[in-house]
Amino acid sequence: TICYNHLTRTSETTEICPDSWYFCYKISLADGNDVRIKRGCTFTCPELRPTGIYVYCCRRDKCNQ
């Protein structure tokens, strides 16, 4: 699987996920008055943390844009 792995305000970059890491994720986190978005590969879909706004998890190449 190929996933985007850039942060909110950086240029788009991708990574090839390690074997058995089938999911791409996109998570938004509240940071004071700002919202940060984090992307990457994962073995299982991440859970929403108290500072999180949403989590998106998918299994297709570059699906976490």
Curated annotation (Swiss-Prot):
One of its GO terms (cellular component) is extracellular region. Disulfide bonds join C3-C24, C17-C41, C45-C57, C58-C63. PROSITE patterns: SNAKE_TOXIN. It is found in: Secreted. GO terms for molecular function: toxin activity. InterPro entries: Snake_3FTx, Snake_toxin-like_sf, Snake_toxin_con_site, Toxin_cobra-type. The keyword Secreted applies. The keyword Disulfide bond applies. Expressed by the venom gland. Keywords: Disulfide bond, G-protein coupled acetylcholine receptor impairing toxin, G-protein coupled receptor impairing toxin, Neurotoxin, Postsynaptic neurotoxin, Secreted, Toxin. Pfam families: Toxin_cobra-type. Belongs to the three-finger toxin family. Short-chain subfamily. Orphan group VIII (haditoxin) sub-subfamily. Antagonist of muscle and neuronal nicotinic acetylcholine receptors (nAChR) with highest affinity for neuronal alpha-7/CHRNA7 nAChRs. Homodimer; non-covalently linked. This is Muscarinic toxin-like protein 3.
